[in-house]
């Protein structure tokens, strides 16, 4: 036995159960997430198959309440259940779509949009993970529910769950003098009102229907008997579903047909045992009402078995109109988010990410834009042609100071939203000292980057290893070292003067025009590239504290890293000591704020929130390193740190008040950048500054 419909779906998908009856709204979830398929369909009229395979959604309201779809705002409402066709999909798709009563502010979250529209309500299952994946749905969506303080509260086992439960929620709480709750509507199947009246507890003289359109009388309401013309849409009948992995479903169909033959009719003196489509004999203990719709709808007359080619999948059976209603719930105020990348490998991963997100129905749609350089991406983001990009701390300084871009999401690495810059050497080179780079061969992750430029250049200035004559900082570095690979040091964006000594690119390994470029076209670009440079050509690598561990002991399958051992390398400490690479906490050159996803400062708080929601849902599905479909934080074979850092464990939203580059980078890091600006000329400090003040 499952605790909810969702537990049962999971049990069936794991071959621990076989069959379940679901309305087509929950069937949509069962199909998409748990790969369930239809097997049989409830038939409500054996004399008319066309009408017998459908029912209608209605909204019941008290007589005397001046209501229309728009005045439901801030009102208390009782729903049959989140995700159900009659109590969720049909009415909400129209309130959000053609009627436009509910303002859509968030993507991927009907509940969050509904919270902004309604007052206190009862929406059973709205706190379930299927509708509350991040646990941030607030309690007002359950305050009308009936089993507070128990495990049944606001679930499908709540006394106010289901169609009959929603009617009880409306009637009991309106007529309870001891409660301040005052619901004005119940969203249910049309036939449920007749059951409640027949069972004797629902007075039809007190209630009417709320219509989605204004009637000829000028009113938005109609009598209860007029549900055929005052309803919120026609819904395909409930389904008996099983796992799509079942290759032979005929035994299940035969079993159901056998049940129908023996137990279809009501009990009689000759057959007093059981009725398949009747629930009234099951009285709720200590409650003055009978149960309804147990396993099957009580107004079911028989089951219909569609041809296999029409029901092999949910989508083959359900009519397109209902699927259009489901899609209406997935509306997003941001139709598309454009992500900027700077090399073909990032572009390929971005396109894979876009396809993976689309497969899970995550909104907004993600598109990928390829630009030549990181600076070009910043410029296009500022000008509104793209929306998001990922930058490390040095580039965040440029993005914020020159392009007015803001950080909205940060990477987390297990130790927190930061990492450490370290200097790595081989153990077999004891003559290499942190305090003397003279004639050394250095490998640096990139010009303008925190680990490869800002922090190491500050260190050689602090230890007086260079004299910066004429304020030419880049030239001073070239005179200190014998050879280096500093990707991007020749790029016009970081060195518009063009006066760059060739030895700062002499160790680089990119082919042709790719040599010494500030992206993955240069083999020695980035944190892992700097370490690879050390293993193949250099003597000191300036990189992250995790880089050695990630690329040794067969953790990186690339050919250059296959035979590397972690204990062949050491860290150079600022005080002159050497330590093993695992002692980075006590032997590093400085702490670096985590990489961030940035956007334009003119984006509203709600736009930024929906950008975050895209990534938040994305990491729920693809945030681990074992997903066979797509891995957000893994770059696969051949490249590292594409779009996101490979060492990222999760992404976190930066609070709105802290979404500015100075607050994220902090005073210590900003002082390091200012030190370089104080000693170097414009265009010769390796930190981007626009020509003639124009970015």
Language model segments and positions:
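Residues embedded in well-ordered beta-strands
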Residues: 58-60, 239-241, 422-424, 596-598
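Beta->alpha turn/N-cap motifs
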Residues: 2-5, 21-28, 33-34, 42-43, ...
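Short, hydrophobic alpha-helical packing/hinge segments within bilobed ligand-binding/sensory domains
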Residues: 7-9, 165-169, 376-378, 529-533
């Amino acid at each position: 036995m499952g605790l909810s419909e969702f537990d049962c779906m999971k049990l069936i998908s794991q071959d621990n159960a076989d069959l379940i009856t679901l309305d087509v709204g929950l069937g949509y979830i069962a199909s998409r997430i748990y790969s369930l398929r239809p097997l049989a369909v409830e038939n409500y009229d054996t004399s008319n198959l066309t009408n017998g395979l459908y029912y209608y959604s209605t909204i019941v309201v008290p007589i005397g309440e001046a209501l229309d779809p728009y005045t439901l705002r801030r009102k208390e409402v009782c729903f049959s259940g989140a995700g159900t066709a009659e109590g969720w999909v049909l009415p909400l798709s129209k309130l959000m779509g053609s009627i436009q009563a509910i303002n859509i502010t968030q993507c991927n979250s009907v509940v969050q949009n509904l919270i902004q529209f309604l007052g206190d309500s009862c929406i059973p299952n709205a706190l379930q993970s299927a509708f509350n994946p991040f646990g941030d749905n607030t309690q007002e969506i359950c305050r009308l529910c009936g089993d507070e303080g128990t495990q049944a509260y606001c679930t499908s086992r709540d006394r106010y769950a289901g169609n009959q439960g929603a009617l009880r929620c409306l009637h009991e709480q309106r007529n309870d003098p001891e409660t301040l709750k005052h619901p004005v509507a119940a969203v249910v199947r049309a036939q449920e009102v007749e059951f409640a009246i027949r069972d004797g507890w629902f007075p039809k003289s007190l209630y009417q229907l709320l219509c989605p359109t204004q009637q000829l009388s000028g009113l938005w309401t109609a009598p209860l008997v007029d549900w055929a013309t005052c309803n919120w849409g026609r819904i395909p009948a409930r389904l008996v579903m099983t796992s799509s992995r079942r290759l032979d479903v005929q035994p299940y169909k035969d079993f159901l047909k056998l049940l129908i033959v023996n137990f279809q009719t009501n009990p009689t003196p000759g057959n007093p045992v059981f009725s398949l489509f009747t629930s009234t004999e099951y009285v709720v203990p200590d409650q003055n009402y009978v149960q309804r719709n147990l396993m099957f709808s009580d107004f079911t007359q028989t089951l219909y078995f569609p041809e296999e080619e029409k029901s092999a999948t949910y989508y083959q059976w359900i009519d397109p109109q209902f699927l259009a209603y489901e899609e209406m719930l997935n509306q997003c105020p941001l139709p598309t988010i454009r992500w900027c990348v700077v090399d073909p490998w990032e572009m390929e991963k971005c396109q894979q990410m876009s396809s993976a997100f689309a497969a899970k129905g995550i909104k907004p749609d993600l598109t990928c834009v390829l630009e030549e350089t990181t600076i070009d991406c910043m410029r296009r983001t500022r000008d509104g042609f793209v929306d998001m990009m990922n930058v490390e701390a040095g580039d965040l300084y440029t993005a914020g100071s020159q392009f007015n871009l803001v950080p909205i999401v940060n990477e987390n690495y297990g130790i927190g939203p930061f990492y450490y810059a370290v200097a790595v050497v081989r153990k077999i080179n004891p003559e290499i000292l942190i305090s003397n780079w003279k004639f050394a061969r250095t490998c640096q992750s990139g010009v303008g980057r925190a680990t490869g430029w800002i922090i190491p250049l500050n260190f050689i200035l602090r230890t007086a290893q260079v004299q910066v004559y004429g304020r030419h900082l880049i030239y001073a570095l070239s005179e200190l070292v014998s050879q280096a690979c500093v990707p991007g040091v020749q790029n016009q964006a970081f060195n518009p003067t063009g006066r760059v000594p060739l030895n700062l690119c002499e160790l680089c390994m990119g082919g042709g025009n790719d040599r010494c470029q500030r992206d993955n076209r240069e083999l020695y670009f980035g944190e892992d590239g700097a370490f690879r440079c050390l293993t193949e050509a250099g003597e000191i690598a300036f990189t992250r504290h995790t880089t050695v561990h990630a690329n040794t002991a067969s953790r990186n399958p690339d050919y250059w890293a296959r035979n590397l051992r972690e204990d062949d390398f050491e860290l150079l400490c600022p005080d002159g000591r050497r330590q093993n690479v695992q002692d980075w906490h006590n032997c590093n050159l400085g702490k670096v704020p985590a990489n961030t996803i940035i956007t334009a400062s003119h984006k509203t708080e709600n736009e930024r929130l929906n950008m975050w929601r895209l990534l938040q849902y994305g990491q729920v599905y693809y945030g681990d390193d074992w997903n066979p479909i797509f891995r957000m934080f893994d770059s696969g074979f051949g490249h590292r740190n594409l779009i996101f850092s490979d060492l990222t464990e999760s992404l976190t939203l930066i609070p709105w008040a802290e979404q500015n580059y100075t607050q994220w980078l902090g005073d210590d890091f900003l002082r390091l950048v200012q030190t370089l600006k104080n000693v170097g000329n414009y265009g010769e400090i390796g930190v981007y500054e626009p020509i003639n003040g124009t970015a």
